[in-house]
Amino acid sequence: MNKLIRRAVTIFAVTSVASLFASGVLETSMAESLSTNVISLADTKAKDNTSHKSKKARKNHSKETPVDRKEVAPVHESKATGPKQDSCFGRMYTVKVNDDRNVEITQAVPEYATVGSPYPIEITATGKRDCVDVIITQQLPCEAEFVRSDPATTPTADGKLVWKIDRLGQGEKSKITVWVKPLKEGCCFTAATVCACPEIRSVTKCGQPAICVKQEGPENACLRCPVVYKINVVNQGTATARNVVVENPVPDGYAHSSGQRVLTFTLGDMQPGEHRTITVEFCPLKRGRATNIATVSYCGGHKNTASVTTVINEPCVQVSIAGADWSYVCKPVEYVISVSNPGDLVLRDVVVEDTLSPGVTVLEAAGAQISCNKVVWTVKELNPGESLQYKVLVRAQTPGQFTNNVVVKSCSDCGTCTSCAEATTYWKGVAATHMCVVDTCDPVCVGENTVYRICVTNRGSAEDTNVSLMLKFSKELQPVSFSGPTKGTITGNTVVFDSLPRLGSKETVEFSVTLKAVSAGDARGEAILSSDTLTVPVSDTENTHIY
């Protein structure tokens, strides 16, 4: 126990003296004197404290030998450096300086050595942060001869060894071993210092962006059907591409829903390996080839383009119908239907459907299926440039304006295709105006009255217009009064009625004239009928016997 106390006191005291010596505060002779006194004092204290209790001994020891634990770390035994056989020095102990700034340095020396026999001094520098230009200086002990060092160096004129380490990383250690040979008895003081510049490292990652663009689109498309293109943009480089922009002019013959002619897509920054997809949709307005070109650009880079060419096809079917503009009812009329394929694709399952208005009767339609007023033809295929012709014979039973509607439906690689046409015929009727004249009393005595009734009937299928009636009587009869659908005038033995503007088909009107028998004889009454339809007036005569 006494031996341990002596060793601890000696180490702490010697370390303090060595620190003062290295800093230049103590001269060599003074350091040796202080070391000798410290060792003697430690021996005396160890003997005096033997009779005291352990608790009191520790208390007195701490009062008489104060140590700054922050500056000097506890002593640790080194794992011996130097030869294992025939060593003339004691076990190594280490003095550690806690420098929490740049570099931590420790120094290990043996407890004792033999005059004339070399012993090692081990210096270890540990980087607490990245440092450069690390300089370690070792003050050789006085009255000792330098033998060698690892790494090798040469003592300076004032007995110092200097090593320079270009760089010492954080946590990295650098070890130096110095062998010296003591020349006389006494304490060999040695001190080491370190100086380092902290290193700050900044990393700038340099790379090259590489923006590539590809485009996907159909080889063929249909007129007025949506065409979709996919624009794929990828950064295949090693750096971020800044301000990536894709421009897509609208191809000639295309239209975009926005109405713009150039579409611009701002993608912003793209990291290495990042992929973006843009979808654009156009409506083709004309047949032919159309090329969609997409151009990508970015900050500091070259522009890249990708294009896709699409052939715009028109699955077109056309139909027309021709017939008489007008005709008389019950007279047959022929319609000619023409179907053609002016497009680029084969039309399949072609159906031609002709629908007639009610009141029109189908008389004949070669190769068609007839159902009431509907006529249907079917064709399996209609090649581009090919045309077909069909005829249908019809007749209207009543006058009027009737329309004949034709619709053609077909299928193609671009979907269904439809076309329609119509023809209107005005069917005219024929007016047939007839007249009938009768007297109500026959024979008649002089002085009595009789009535002539005139019935006018349009037996035709069309109206008659401006129907006029005039009656002439012989001298035996004197007109007294009249009635009818229009006004009349009596002039002597003649009665004239105003014209009837319209006499419809199957319509009948009646005129009447009251006559007085004024003299005996065989009297006559003549009715004369005229109209726009009657190119020559029609007359009818009635006789009346008067006695």
UniProtKB/Swiss-Prot annotation:
Its main location: periplasm. The keyword Signal applies. GO terms for biological process: regulation of cell shape. In elementary bodies (EBs, the infectious stage, which is able to survive outside the host cell) provides the structural integrity of the outer envelope through disulfide cross-links with the small cysteine-rich protein and the major outer membrane porin. It has been described in publications as the Sarkosyl-insoluble COMC (Chlamydia outer membrane complex), and serves as the functional equivalent of peptidoglycan. Residues 52-61 have a biased composition (Basic residues). It is found in: Periplasm. InterPro entries: Chlam_OMP6, Chlamydia_OmcB, DUF11_rpt, Ig-like_fold, OmcB-like_DUF11. This is Large cysteine-rich periplasmic protein OmcB, serovar C. Keywords: Cell shape, Disulfide bond, Periplasm, Signal. Residues 23-40 form a propeptide. Pfam families: Chlam_OMP6 (PF03504), DUF11 (PF01345). It comes from the Bacteria. Residues 62-79 have a biased composition (Basic and acidic residues). The keyword Signal applies. Part of a disulfide cross-linked outer membrane complex (COMC) composed of the major outer membrane porin (MOMP), the small cysteine-rich protein (OmcA) and the large cysteine-rich periplasmic protein (OmcB). Residues 45-84 are annotated as: Disordered. One of its GO terms (molecular function) is extracellular matrix structural constituent. Residues 1-22 form the signal peptide. One of its GO terms (cellular component) is periplasmic space.
